[in-house]
Amino acid sequence: MELISIPALSDNYIWLLCDENRHVVIVDPAESQPVLDTLESRGWIPDAILLTHHHHDHVGGVPGIIDRFPELLVYGPAETQSKGATIIVCGGDSINFGHFSFQIIDVPGHTLGHIAFYQAPYLFCGDTLFSGGCGRLFEGTAEQMYTSIGKIAELPDDTLICCAHEYTISNMKFAHAVLPNQTISEYQQKVIRMRENNQPTIPTTLQTEKKINIFLKCDDIDLQRNIGITPNSQPLSAVFHQLRRQKDQF
């Protein structure tokens, strides 16, 4: 498999995944031209588009890509039907063609219908889990998002987290403010250097995220204390909610 990230808009990543038989999927195309240019440069013809949720910066490129490849299948949750999805999928479904076998995982929170696509080791999780952070709660509840992130945390440690935004520096700045330790500090400096060299910090691995992503550390006593919660006095979803609120105001 070959994985390509295409920078788009101000901080988006569009993903292309190509299997050994040159079957290609496009994930969350924010805009069309960068995708069309990349496909042309490699001589690839896409088979499908995968949409994680309905926000414009994840679906804006669908019409332009469909104009060029009108036979494309477009998979997405029900909330993306008006954005171009032709095959509606939800948690528990699977998508199989070529060497692809994607499992669909329901991950509501950022939006109510948000889904993720998983084919080991790749997880295309849209705006659910970022490196060092997680998505805002635009439609869902903190409890939903906490449960969704928990589903991701149960995947193998070598899972590649292919999220849709380059937010890592700002996420790590907040993480260091909340839970200043050597591991987080070192990773913060690492991603700063990467971005200074115009390198993407994505994909990351689930193993890395378990070490540096404070939204996966809601059971940490020091973290709870540092965000104003008496240790072990609240459900972990409430700790997550408080952490997300503080990130929104950071």
Curated annotation (Swiss-Prot):
Q: Which PANTHER family match?
A: HYDROXYACYLGLUTATHIONE HYDROLASE, HYDROXYACYLGLUTATHIONE HYDROLASE GLOB
Pathway named in the protein's UniProt entry: Secondary metabolite metabolism; methylglyoxal degradation; (R)-lactate from methylglyoxal: step 2/2
Source organism of the structure:
Photorhabdus laumondii subsp. laumondii (strain DSM 15139 / CIP 105565 / TT01) (Photorhabdus luminescens subsp. laumondii)
What family does this chain come from, according to its entry?
A: Belongs to the metallo-beta-lactamase superfamily. Glyoxalase II family.
Q: What is this protein called?
A: Hydroxyacylglutathione hydrolase
**Which Gene3D superfamilies did the record assign?**
Ribonuclease Z/Hydroxyacylglutathione hydrolase-like
Keyword tags: Hydrolase, Metal-binding, Zinc
Which enzyme type, at the first EC level?
A: hydrolase
